[in-house]
């Protein structure tokens, strides 16, 4: 149409100057400039044919260029690309720019003045050099793209080079402003799409300049411009890669660049393959594909120079190995394309091809890499970073399995990849989950593969590489945030690496950093196990000649002894053996060298560090100084005990004397100092501190954790040594505590130390027997009296000083220690039960009395000028002094707790208090309780424990008379507990104390008796605890364990009515019986790994060192069930409790059933119902007939509800047991079959299953004939039911019933014999392999009918483990019988054999009866080396045909049809399927598109196309543009003012609902599978995507095109409608 218009204009006016002048007048609209452009192009064509005016035309062109186009472009360049333009919208501005640029190119050609082109280019280049944000940069790009082809390669060569350099810098992001990412990206896209393709056509100088800018070292991968570089490279791929063709083409291109030979090019491609942006990955794949195709077509050898001096090239080609190379690269590209999807079922079939890549890549003859291994790493990196976690896991497993079947040559890339992307992928905890069907407590499959891989890989590493690799591996474990599970399995894998001298001091420090930094917040058991593995790693991999014993001891201190390295564990023994073997090979320690020991010896080292430790330094002067840190004492004690045990290994049979001698050698310096404590008054204070610290740590560390703790010689000898120093130490401590020597804030830590030592000494003497003449006895008595005296003297009201107040705190702490010691050890009772001075003093204490804070100036007089300033600054602050006061109040309540426990019988229970009490704190309990509430508001959460202990004594006494006060104590205590939920160290002790006072049996009994507010408050707190336990595992365990234990004790001590109070709290047992949350995957994973560690038993030292707290949810139910098993059905209170619980369980079942009619398997509803019926089965033996008579209807009714399989089995089982024990209920059972078929539906199967066990039901009935007759009548009716399942169950019941009838030989049934036997025979002999016969065989083999015996299988193991396992219940619900036996808080019932299954049922597997064929085909398929067919994304880059005159085709088609309504062009050249093309053709015709572009016009003859197009192709212009011609076609349309719009999901795609279509729009649709190829994406002006809400995120290309065509049409209709009057 444009050409027709140009012809008409020229025919009317043959003077081009007049015509062009007319067009150059008026407003510079897009339409005017476009008309000028196509008129100039028409004149240019005539000039080329020689028919134009020779003189007038060049002059006219010069005038148009100088007088109109150049000023127009300058005015457009004067405004910034993103700035406001009052006259033109952005899209119209771009349209004007492109039309003006194309017109300018025609003017330059017509004018015949190359200097004009150069001048315009110089001017535009200046704008570009000013940066992309400068005004006119976008216009400058259009000008350069227009005049570039007119520049002369030789004369304008320097200019071309400068333009090319500037363009490359802009395209690589150099034109951005740093913080302006958007403009820089726009510049890169515009320059790469418009300017660079034009420049590389201008000759060798420009092309070399472009390639030089891309391949320069400064533009290498390290600059981080991968996306921009790939944008440019894919745009210029045709010029940067050799042109396949004849010799002439090759000769012409010899001087041109060949990107295949540049290693930077390939590194950029590899980096692109691993980018997060899908479009960047697509461009990288395109470049790889083009390079491979070019290499195959050229047929010439090619090698890319390696980045390093050795190893294979990044890319090479050999014509001799063309087939193998093509096979490798085709598979490689196929895998990379397939990985773009997220569907695992599409990707998994392609993974075997990855194994083939390794076969191609490694030479079997030389054992070296043929292809650079970095290509394989790109695939794995892509898999690791996939959005699909299943694919990530598949990728990790595939990589870890590499060395199982093949040995790959060493490559540095492999090692770097393991340290980098692989370890990053391994940091994902979900990878370590159990496989389906794998039992709980087994090791993670991925953990095992990781261990096997690491062991194999390190064994194959060259010796010189192993050390650096392992060091990097360990350092990587500290370089990021790691969760507990990955660190555990990485540590386990390292621990299994065979012994090798690989690590030095750096490795030891790296291991220490892992423990200190990475694992500090991990779960305790996982952290402990990981520490064990890291110690084993150190022992296996340490080169002892590079480290000293000092280094080793410092590393050992990083291990927490309370979590991993405990004496007596297998790990301790292993460490001792390692030290024994290597002690003479360690590097000499600085300590040993300083005392003249050159030969390394563990004994010498330990002796030296003890001497150094005990020896006082010159700076240890002054009394008011900090107490030393505990680190050194821990280190010395650890090394002493290790050395003693190592010596014991050397002389295994020498006995106690040898141990005593060795210990004496080590500890003589310490013992000498300790013996002088009481006589040397001038001994430095720090020296005494350190010696006492060492004493404590030696006693604590030497305690064995294993089973042989009773006969430990080391511990005995050590205790004897220290007992000999008791008198000296106790005299010293007594002096320090009572003689006003502790008078500064820093001395409070010393007070704590002294009291701990005194407690240890008391324990030592108690072990050997308490004697009244013992020095400790005298010291305790004197300490008690002196402390009381100090406290009484300081109440005189004098002005407080720091010294006096500190002594007051010290005296109260000492008194608290004495009270605790007396309370815990009855042997220490110094006085009779009559109240002595201690009791009288404690009872009259002013509770919660705040210590008055001394004045600051007075404090400073006590301060040492250098050593204590910071401590005193803290004490002078409110917070610092507050801590001291809180400790004082805490110690007061410790003493009071002792007093209340001792004299609890004197506490009055009535509201009236004694007028003149001799023990006020005891005999005035209300006042004491009020003080306790005040203390709870003052004390921090880690100091409330003694207050809770006091409340435990006070609350039962006052609950009746002062209920409101007791309720207030409940509330305040619960507030403290609920705020503590994240503080592990103090939470559990406080919770235990809280439970003991709120749920004390006396409190529960009184509250239930009066039924006041306290009763309801206790129940409220009970439910809050249960609610908290859903978040914090183990909370409910504490409550249920304590209550069950207290009820058991009360039941055994008191006769009738002993459990009556428990009946009032049966909800607690009910909730315990059905307790158990559905954990998130991450929580379940941690629990699985913890179970795995626990199952390791003694092999993992963490299990020995840390006691099993039994905080799993299972133990709540186990506790409740074991409690129920202890109840006696003949005891009336027990019987009432059981019956009340049974009714509540049935209520719960009905409530769950009503809340959700349908529920999925293993949901919380399913689990709760399952637990209800498990508990009812446990209770059944204790239920009598009268009670069952009231609930039997409810049990039968439960059988009619829609239940999961496991619940059905339990209901059927309990019905069988009831009918067996009480046949009187059989009439009600028969009634269940007459409810009406519509009401029953398939639930009748439950009762038919019960009927199949009629032999068990009638076992104790002498007359069975009537029952059998009734059963046969019922069953035969249901054998004719229309439902297949019902018939199947009825036939099984019939078969089993008929077997019983035949055994009894009842004559009345003879008439039925032919009918029944023929029916059963017909069922048995069903022909064929249909479902009916299979299901008949399966139901007969089903465990419930074939193996299960309702009486013999009645045991806890069947109820809680075997039946849930066989019925397909999730493993979380399986409770093994071992857990029942391990839980010792509640004792075993008398008939323990009732717990265990004695039948064959326990040996059955779920696979014996359930269908397990799902997934077997997948397993077989995974092992196949090749797949016959896979889904492949097709890239249409192969076909290359000669260019056609596209515009003539369009003219011809349009002229023939004479129909064009809109200005929309739809390009579908990339679409392959005729169905999609036919549908698009129809849609385009309906909405009036101007033209549909297809890849081949032959498609219109396809029947599928015709079927869907319904003759639309006859009314719509069709143009053929083959895929290789698309770039030229799109460039042409751009110059005609079209906006190129792509339908593609990219990072910068615009939402279709937000995009406004220009009138001249070209819509480019992508291929069905691959989308729009990378080389076309940069031709797009904009990408539009359709907003999607679903999961698949992919629309059919025809549907996508139709949506955009309609949106374009809708917008145009609206805009035209708005312009109408």
Swiss-Prot record:
Monomer and homodimer. The lineage of its organism: Eukaryota, Metazoa, Chordata, Craniata, Vertebrata. Keywords: Acetylation, Methyltransferase, Phosphoprotein, RNA-binding, S-adenosyl-L-methionine, Transferase, tRNA processing, tRNA-binding. Pfam families: SpoU_methylase, TARBP1. It catalyses: guanosine(18) in tRNA + S-adenosyl-L-methionine = 2'-O-methylguanosine(18) in tRNA + S-adenosyl-L-homocysteine + H(+). One of its GO terms (cellular component) is nucleus. PANTHER family: METHYLTRANSFERASE TARBP1-RELATED, RNA METHYLTRANSFERASE. The keyword tRNA-binding applies. The modification Phosphoserine is found at residue 1442. This is tRNA (guanosine(18)-2'-O)-methyltransferase TARBP1. It comes from Homo sapiens (Human).
């Amino acid at each position: 149409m444009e050409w027709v218009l140009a012809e008409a204009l020229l025919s009317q006016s043959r003077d081009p100057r007049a015509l062009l002048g007319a067009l150059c007048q008026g407003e510079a609209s897009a339409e005017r400039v476009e008309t000028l452009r196509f008129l100039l192009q028409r004149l240019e064509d005539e000039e080329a044919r020689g028919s134009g005016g020779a003189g007038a035309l060049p002059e006219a062109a010069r005038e148009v260029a100088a007088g109109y186009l150049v000023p127009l472009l300058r005015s457009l360049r004067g405004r910034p690309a993103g700035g406001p333009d009052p006259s033109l919208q952005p899209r119209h501005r771009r349209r004007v720019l492109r039309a003006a640029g194309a017109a300018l190119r025609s003017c330059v050609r017509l004018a015949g003045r190359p200097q004009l082109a150069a001048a315009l280019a110089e001017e535009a280049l200046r704008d570009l050099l000013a940066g992309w944000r400068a005004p006119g940069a976008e216009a400058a790009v259009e000008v350069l793209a227009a005049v570039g082809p007119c520049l002369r390669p030789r004369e304008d060569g320097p200019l071309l080079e400068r333009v090319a350099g500037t363009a490359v810098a802009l395209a690589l992001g150099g034109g951005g402003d740093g913080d302006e990412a958007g403009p820089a990206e726009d510049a890169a896209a515009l320059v790469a799409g418009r300017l660079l393709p034009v420049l590389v056509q201008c000759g060798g100088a420009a092309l070399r300049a472009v390639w030089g800018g891309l391949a320069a070292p400064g533009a290498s991968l390290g600059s981080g411009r991968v996306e921009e570089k790939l944008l440019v490279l894919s745009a210029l791929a045709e010029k940067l890669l050799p042109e396949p063709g004849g010799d002439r083409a090759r000769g012409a291109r010899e001087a041109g660049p060949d990107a295949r030979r540049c290693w930077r090019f390939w590194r950029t491609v590899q980096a692109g393959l691993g980018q997060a942006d899908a479009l960047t990955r697509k461009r990288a794949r395109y470049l790889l594909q083009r390079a491979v195709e070019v290499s195959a077509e050229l047929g010439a050898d090619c090698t890319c120079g390696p980045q390093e001096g050795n190893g294979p090239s990044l890319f090479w080609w050999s014509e001799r190995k063309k087939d193998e190379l093509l096979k490798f690269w085709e598979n490689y590209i196929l895998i990379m394309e397939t990985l773009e999807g997220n569907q695992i079922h599409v990707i998994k079939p392609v993974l075997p091809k990855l194994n083939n890549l390794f076969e191609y890549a490694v030479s079997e003859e030389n054992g070296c890499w043929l292809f650079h291994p970095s290509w394989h790493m790109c695939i794995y990196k892509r898999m690791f970073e996939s959005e699909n976690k299943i694919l990530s896991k598949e990728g990790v497993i595939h990589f870890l399995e590499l060395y199982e079947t093949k040995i790959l040559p060493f490559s540095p890339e492999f090692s770097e990849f393991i340290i980098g992307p692989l370890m990053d992928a391994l940091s994902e905890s979900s990878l370590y989950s159990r496989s389906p069907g794998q039992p709980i407590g087994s090791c993670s499959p991925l953990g095992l593969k990781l261990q096997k891989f690491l062991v194999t890989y390190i064994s194959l590493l060259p010796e010189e590489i192993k050390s650096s690799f392992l060091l990097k591996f360990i350092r990587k474990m500290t370089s990021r945030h790691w969760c507990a599970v990955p660190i555990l399995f990485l540590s386990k894998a390292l621990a299994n690496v065979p012994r090798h001298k690989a690590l030095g001091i750096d490795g030891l420090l790296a291991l220490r950093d892992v423990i200190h930094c990475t694992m500090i917040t991990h779960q305790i058991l996982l952290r402990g196990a990981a520490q064990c593995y890291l110690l084993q790693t150190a022992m296996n991999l340490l080169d002892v000649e590079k480290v000293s014993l000092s280094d080793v001891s410092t590393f050992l201190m990083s291990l927490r002894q309370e979590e991993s390295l405990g004496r007596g564990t297998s790990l301790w023994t292993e460490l001792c053996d390692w030290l024994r073997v290597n002690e003479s090979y360690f590097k000499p320690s600085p300590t040993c060298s300083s005392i003249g020991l050159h030969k390394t010896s563990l004994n010498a080292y330990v002796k030296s560090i003890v001497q150094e430790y005990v020896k006082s330094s010159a700076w240890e002067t002054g009394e008011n100084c900090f107490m030393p840190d505990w680190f050194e004492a821990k280190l010395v004690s650890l090394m002493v005990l290790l050395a003693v045990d190592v010596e014991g290994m050397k002389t295994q049979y020498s006995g106690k004397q040898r141990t005593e001698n060795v210990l004496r050698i080590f500890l003589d310096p310490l013992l000498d100092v300790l013996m002088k404590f009481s006589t040397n008054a001038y001994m430095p204070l720090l020296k005494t501190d350190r010696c006492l610290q060492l004493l404590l740590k030696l006693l604590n560390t030497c305690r064995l954790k294993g089973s042989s703790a009773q006969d430990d010689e080391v511990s005995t000898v050590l205790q004897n040594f220290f007992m000999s120093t008791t008198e000296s130490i106790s005299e010293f401590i007594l002096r320090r505590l009572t003689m006003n020597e502790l008078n500064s804030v820093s001395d409070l830590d010393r007070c704590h130390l002294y009291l701990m030592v005194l407690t240890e000494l008391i324990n030592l003497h108690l072990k050997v027997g308490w004697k009244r003449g013992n020095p400790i006895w005298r010291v305790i008595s004197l300490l008690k009296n002196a402390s009381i005296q100090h406290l009484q003297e300081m109440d005189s009201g004098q002005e407080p000083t720091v010294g006096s107040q500190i002594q007051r705190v010290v005296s109260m702490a000492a008194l608290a220690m004495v009270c605790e010691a007396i309370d815990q050890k009855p042997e220490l009772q110094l006085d009779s039960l009559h109240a002595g001075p201690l009791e009288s003093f404690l009872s009259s204490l002013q509770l919660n009395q705040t210590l008055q804070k001394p004045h600051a100036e007075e404090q400073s007089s006590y301060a040492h000028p250098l050593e204590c300033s910071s401590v005193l600054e803290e004490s002078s602050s409110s917070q610092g002094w507050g801590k001291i006061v809180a400790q004082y109040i805490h110690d007061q309540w410790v003493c009071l707790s002792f007093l209340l426990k001792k004299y609890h019988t004197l506490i009055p229970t009535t509201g009236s208090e004694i007028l003149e009490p001799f023990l006020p704190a005891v005999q005035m309990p209300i006042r004491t309780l009020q003080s306790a509430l005040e203390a709870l508001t003052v004390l921090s959460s880690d100091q409330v424990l003694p207050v809770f202990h006091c409340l435990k004594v006070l609350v039962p006494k006052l609950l009746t008379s002062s209920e409101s006060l007791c309720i207030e104590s409940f509330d305040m205590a619960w507030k403290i507990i609920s705020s503590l939920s994240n503080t592990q160290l103090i939470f559990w002790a406080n919770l235990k104390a809280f439970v003991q006072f709120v749920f004390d049996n006396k409190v529960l009994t009184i509250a239930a008796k009066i039924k006041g507010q306290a009763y309801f408050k206790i129940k409220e707190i009970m439910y809050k605890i249960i609610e908290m336990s859903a978040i914090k595992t183990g909370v409910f365990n504490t409550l249920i364990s304590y209550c069950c234990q207290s009820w058991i004790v009360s039941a055994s001590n008191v006769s009738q009515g002993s459990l009556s109070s428990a009946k009032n709290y049966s909800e607690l047992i009910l909730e315990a019986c059905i307790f158990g949350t559905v954990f998130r995957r991450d929580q379940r994973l941690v629990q699985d790994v913890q179970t795995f560690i626990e199952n390791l038993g003694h092999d993992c030292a963490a299990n020995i060192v840390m006691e099993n707290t039994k905080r799993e949810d299972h133990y709540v139910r186990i506790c409740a069930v074991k409690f129920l098993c202890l109840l006696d059905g003949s005891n009336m209170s027990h019987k009432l409790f059981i019956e009340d619980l049974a009714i509540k369980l049935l209520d719960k079942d009905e409530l769950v059933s009503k809340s959700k009619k349908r529920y999925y398997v293993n949901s919380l509803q399913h689990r709760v119902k399952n637990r209800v019926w498990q508990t009812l089965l446990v209770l059944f033996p204790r239920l009598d007939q009268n009670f069952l008579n009231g609930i039997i209807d409810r049990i039968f009714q439960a059988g009619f509800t829609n239940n999961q399989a496991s619940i059905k089995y339990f209901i059927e089982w309990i019905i069988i047991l009831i009918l067996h024990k009480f046949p009187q209920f059989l009439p009600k059972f028969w009634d269940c079959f007459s409810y009406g078929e519509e009401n029953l539906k398939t639930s009748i199967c439950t009762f038919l299953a019960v009927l199949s066990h009629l032999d068990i039901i009638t076992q104790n009935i002498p007359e069975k004939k009537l029952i059998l007759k009734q059963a046969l009548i019922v069953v035969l009716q249901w054998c004719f039911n229309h439902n297949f399942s019902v018939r199947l169950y009825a036939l099984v019941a019939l078969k089993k019933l008929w077997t019983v009838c035949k055994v009894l030989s009842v004559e009345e049934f003879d008439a039925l014999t032919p009918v029944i036997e023929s029916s059963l025979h017909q069922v048995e002999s069903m022909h064929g392999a249909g479902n009916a016969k299979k299901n008949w065989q399966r139901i007969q083999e089903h465990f419930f009918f074939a193996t299960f015996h309702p009486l013999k299988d009645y045991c806890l193991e069947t109820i809680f483990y075997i039946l849930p396992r066989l019925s397909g219940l999730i493993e979380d619900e399986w409770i093994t019988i071992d857990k029942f036996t391990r839980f010792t808080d509640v004792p075993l019932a008398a008939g323990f054999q009732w717990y265990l299954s004695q039948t064959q049922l326990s040996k059955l597997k779920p696979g014996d009866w359930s269908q397990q064929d799902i997934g077997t085909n997948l397993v077989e398929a995974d092992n196949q080396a090749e797949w016959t067919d896979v889904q492949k994304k097709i890239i249409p880059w192969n076909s290359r045909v000669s260019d056609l005159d596209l515009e003539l085709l369009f003219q011809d088609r349009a002229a023939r049809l004479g129909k064009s309504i809109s200005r929309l062009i739809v390009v579908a050249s990339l679409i392959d399927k005729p169905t999609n093309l036919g549908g698009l053709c129809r849609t385009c015709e309906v909405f009036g598109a101007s033209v549909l572009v297809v890849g081949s016009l032959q498609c219109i003859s396809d029947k599928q196309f015709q079927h869907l197009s319904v003759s639309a192709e006859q009314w719509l212009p069709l143009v053929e543009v083959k895929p290789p011609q698309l770039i030229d076609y799109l460039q042409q349309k751009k110059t005609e003012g079209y906006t190129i719009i792509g339908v593609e999901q990219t990072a910068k795609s615009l939402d279709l609902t937000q995009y406004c279509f220009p009138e001249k729009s070209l819509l480019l649709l992508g291929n069905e599978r691959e989308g729009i190829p990378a080389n076309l994406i940069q031709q797009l002006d904009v990408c539009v995507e359709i907003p999607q809400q679903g999961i698949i995120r992919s629309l059919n290309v025809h549907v996508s095109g139709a949506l955009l065509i309609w949106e374009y049409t809708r917008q145009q209709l609206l805009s035209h409608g708005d312009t109408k009057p």
